Regions:
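N-terminal catalytic cores of secreted or lumenal carbohydrate-active enzymes
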Residues: 1-106, 110, 119-121, 148
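Catalytic grooves of carbohydrate-active enzymes
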Residues: 6-15, 25, 152, 179-199, ...
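Short, solvent-exposed turn/loop segments enriched in Gly/Ser/Thr/Pro and often Arg
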Residues: 58-67, 94-96, 130-139, 157-161, ...
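Conserved short loop/turn motifs at secondary-structure junctions
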Residues: 62-66, 97-99, 127-137, 240-245, ...
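Acidic, His- and aromatic-enriched active-site or binding-groove loops in soluble protein domains
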Residues: 74-94, 143-176
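CE4/NodB-like, metal-dependent polysaccharide N-deacetylase domain
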Residues: 108-141, 148, 219-239
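Catalytic domains of cell-wall/extracellular-matrix polysaccharide-remodeling enzymes
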Residues: 123-163, 247-254
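C-terminal (or distal) subdomains of carbohydrate-active enzymes
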Residues: 142-145, 179, 191-199, 203-204, ...
Length: 855
């Protein structure tokens, strides 16, 4: 055999069965934080390494090192010394091992830039090896990002099997995934148990750690070697590690004892790089001859219940992504004006905690969920403070709507009403369309790219507003068919048509009957197996990770829906409905109610859906149906790319995939001469079912799993504070339906505009022009100050895969342009003559530019 590399590395979660920085108190026991467990691992490894020079260990993520050094700054030189002696390496998994299906491509890139800059600062270099261990899927643009970051190997991909030597992304970029043969291991899956003496509080018996150290030593598996896997002409690996257990010095003796039989030593994943140099040399030249290529451009699907479990983990992340993006644009404007820009590192670390794979997936105990929500709450104050430094506040009561996107648009904004009072929002091109004392619906017309609009908030006369609203409402109550535990059904009621300049929507007492597109001149949605915007209750027996049983009984809720009222004004109409889910469909739990409406606004070519849901259910999933009149290809937006909904065979296991797709911004289906598209804002779970009547798109907005899976491991410990996985309580959702003549890049822009609402800021943004797309299909996904303070970063992606030229405007302040990689390393100069720059994109290509000011 060539060599046996022994790697030691624990997998470190930030949240899951524990909190990151908080202890959990439950039933009289204390469960220590992951932070403390990670410290125990590093301290133990340092202790062994200082005594045994042949010992080597890895740390999985930058956040673990950063957090450790924050708490123990005196250990920085110790870690550096071990690194220089080749006893320590830190894998490049990003700052956190994030999800890659439900977060924006810019969040994914930022996570790696944050990691790489931190590791370079501490250790002077960054690993060329990536790990995606335990991430629930890998999307289509990752190979391109990894290649641009200079990564040479992916050492671990979990749950979905990767086949072959190479994974080729949707743009054609590829990364090596070949790994040495697994020949043995040591470690253990069991978790640290609270000390029985002190119940986790910390005492002399447990060395004040709060865990049962004696049991921990017994749980560690001894080294096991599989001789039949050690081949004469190959490099093999022995992998040691756990999630919580810490290694013992005896491991070194066990490895040394094998040296008489094998060429074996402790090492790192990077030690395999010389053995795949030939593969990487071919990839550098775009040569795939003789290489085995993974059959898909993504490594999905698994754990598909994560797309909807604990839905606020998805919604809060999307909101925060948008807010941080707006902040970066404000900072870019400030930089152009003053040459100064804030450091966003701490904000990035804070918000990307919510992008960690178990965070956004919703696969955690209740206390960890609370920690994530609290982190978002505390981040709001930090963002407000930075925003105040980037804007100029006036003495008046004026506020500003700010458009953080590079497109001109009509934008609908929903603003909360203070103290339940009706409010009026006014300003040039600003209209208050309606206010119910909870939410004011506002239309901001023709706001420029990166532009702002002044507005004022005044309190409306509640009495007169209520009287006007009552006069405009006409309630249609159907006929009650039955009641009691089986619920109240409604039937009948007049038909009525409401609409805007684009759509005519026929409604009745039970919901929406049909939708007619006035531009395409055809009915694009109609009642069939399901009604447009109908809520559907589906049996879903599973865990937060996935549905576990192949039983999907769907119950239409149309008959349990009644029309509450219709409001029509000049240029605006909406219909309000109430759907009450019967107790018999909710585990005899009452108060499962959906209050929802559809709104149509002149100047907004979408049918807007919003809902408030009171949810108290068990083993159920709530979906919204969108029937189309054709059975063409389904496709959806992944981070940074529009991709087809690849057919896959559902499978049912603890990490299974049961038919859904992660639609980051939109899902669509090609119908009868048109494309029906559904936009979302943090509800990515999308499925499509086809029949002779046409395709029905379903967007899942809630689920209530009751199987805790690995949240409950009696062989480790029992801590049952995970009932929140059923997502009990109040929720709010927004969706939109829009139809197109054909698939185009316009869908990408419209979906982004729907999900990314206007920001509300207290001061004026700096008066500085930023680049926009003048012509072409690529879209600008990021504008921000360069990390080195020497320019503005502009990233463009051909998300729709058109592969054509795109022209951007060049503001007068631009004196030079550099093409860079995603890490902002300059590659070459680009021309600056004239007022525009034209770039040629291959399909799905990512390009990063640095625009520099004059001296």
């Amino acid at each position: 055999m060539e060599k046996i590399i022994v790697t030691l590395e624990n997998h470190f979660d930030q949240v899951w069965r524990r909190c990151f920085k908080r202890n959990i108190e439950n039933d009289g026991y204390t469960y220590i934080s992951y932070e403390k467990i990670e410290e125990m691992y590093i301290d133990r490894c340092i202790e062994i390494a200082e005594k045994r020079p042949e010992f080597r260990f890895q740390i999985e993520t930058a956040v673990v090192v950063d957090n450790y050094l924050h708490n123990h700054p005196e250990k920085k030189e110790v870690l550096r010394r071990l690194y220089d002696r080749k006893q320590l390496r830190v894998m490049d998994s990003g700052y956190y091992i994030t999800d890659s299906n439900m977060i924006g491509i810019e969040s994914f890139i930022t996570d790696f830039l944050l990691s790489d800059r931190f590791l370079k600062d501490v250790f002077g270099e960054v690993s060329a090896v990536v790990t995606r261990r335990d991430a629930f899927g890998n999307s289509a643009q990752l190979p391109q990002v990894f290649r641009d970051l200079g990564k040479k190997s992916i050492a671990a991909i979990s749950y979905s099997r990767v086949y072959g030597d190479v994974w080729r992304g949707i743009d054609g970029s590829a990364v090596c995934v070949k790994q040495p043969t697994f020949a043995g291991g040591a470690g253990g899956w069991k978790k640290l148990v609270p000390c029985p003496e002190c119940k986790g509080k910390g005492c002399k018996k447990c060395d004040y750690t709060g865990v049962d150290r004696e049991r921990e030593r017994k749980e560690w598996w001894n080294l096991t070697v599989y001789p039949e896997r050690i081949l004469a002409d190959e490099v093999t690996t022995i992998t040691m590690g756990c999630e919580e257990l810490t290694p013992a010095e005896s491991l070194v003796d066990e490895v040394n004892a094998l040296k008489s039989k094998y060429p074996i030593e402790f090492g790192f994943n990077e030690d395999y790089l010389p053995y795949i140099e030939d593969i990487n040399a071919k990839l550098d030249c775009g040569d795939f001859s003789g290489l085995s290529v993974h059959p898909s451009f993504q490594v999905n699907f698994n754990n598909t219940g994560c797309y909807v479990s604990r839905i606020k983990t998805k919604q809060r992340l999307i909101e925060t992504e948008n807010t941080v993006s707006d902040l970066e644009v404000l900072a870019a404007k400030k930089y152009v004006s003053t040459g100064e820009a804030p450091d966003f590192s701490e904000i990035y670390k804070h918000y990307l905690f919510g992008a960690f794979h178990d965070s956004i997936a919703g696969t955690m105990v209740d206390a960890a969920y609370d920690e994530i929500m609290a982190a978002y709450d505390s981040l709001s104050g930090k963002i407000e403070a930075v925003s105040a430094r980037l804007t100029d506040k006036t003495e008046s009561s004026e506020k500003y709507f700010f458009n953080g996107l590079p497109i001109k648009r009509n934008a609908v904004v929903y603003m909360g009403c203070p103290n339940g009072k009706n409010i009026e929002i006014s300003g040039e091109g600003v209209k208050t369309l309606g206010c119910d004392g909870k939410i004011a619906t506002v239309l901001v017309e023709n706001i420029e790219p990166y532009g702002a609009r002044v507005f004022k908030i005044t309190e409306a006369d509640n009495k007169s507003a209520k009287a006007t609203e009552t006069a405009e409402k006409v309630a249609f109550h159907g006929t009650v068919l039955n009641g009691a535990d089986e619920g109240t059904k409604f039937s009948g009621g007049e038909k009525r048509v409401i609409g805007n300049l684009r759509y005519a929507v026929t409604i009745n007492g039970n919901g929406v009957e049909s939708i007619y597109d006035k531009i395409l001149r055809k009915t694009v949605c109609a009642v069939g197996a399901f009604s447009p915007f109908e809520h559907v209750l589906e049996t879903d027996i599973g865990s937060p990770w996935t549905t576990l049983e192949n039983y999907f009984n769907k119950t239409r809720l149309r008959d349990y829906t009644r029309l509450i009222g219709v409001t029509e004004k000049s240029g605006y109409a909406h219909a309000e409905f109430r759907t009450a889910i019967p107790n018999s469909m909710s585990g005899e739990s009452n108060d499962n109610v959906i209050e929802w409406k559809i709104a149509l606004i002149d100047g907004v070519d979408e049918i807007l859906y919003s809902s408030r849901v009171e949810w108290h259910n068990f083993n159920r999933r709530l979906k919204v149906a969108f029937p189309a009149t054709g059975n063409g290809e389904a496709f959806y937006s992944a981070p940074g790319a529009v991709i087809p909904a690849e057919k896959y065979e559902p499978y049912f296991s603890w990490s299974g995939a049961t038919g859904d797709y992660p639609a980051y911004r939109f899902a669509a289906v090609e119908a009868d001469g048109y494309v029906a598209t559904v936009f979302n804002a943090g509800t990515p779970s999308f499925g499509v079912e086809k029949s002779n009547d046409g395709a029905v798109m379903f967007v899942s907005i809630l689920r209530s799993p009751t199987v805790p899976t690995y949240l409950h491991e009696p062989q480790s410990y029992t801590m049952k504070a995970w009932d929140g996985m059923r997502d009990n309580g109040s929720h709010e959702f927004r969706l939109a339906l829009k139809t197109y003549e054909k698939r185009s890049a316009d869908i990408v822009l419209d979906a982004e505009a729907f999900a990314h609402s206007l920001a509300v800021i207290d001061g004026a943004a700096a008066n500085a022009e930023l680049p926009i797309v003048k012509d072409g299909k690529a879209v600008i996904t990021r504008v921000k100050p360069a990390y080195d303070g020497d320019g503005i970063i502009v990233r463009l992606i051909d998300e729709n895969g058109d592969g054509d030229e795109t022209t951007i405007s060049l503001p007068a302040w631009v004196k030079s342009i550099k093409l860079t990689d995603v890490a902002e390393n300059e590659k070459r100069d680009l021309p600056t003559s004239g007022k525009t720059l034209t770039l040629t994109f291959r399909p799905f290509e990512i390009k990063t530019l640095k625009l520099k000011r004059g001296k």
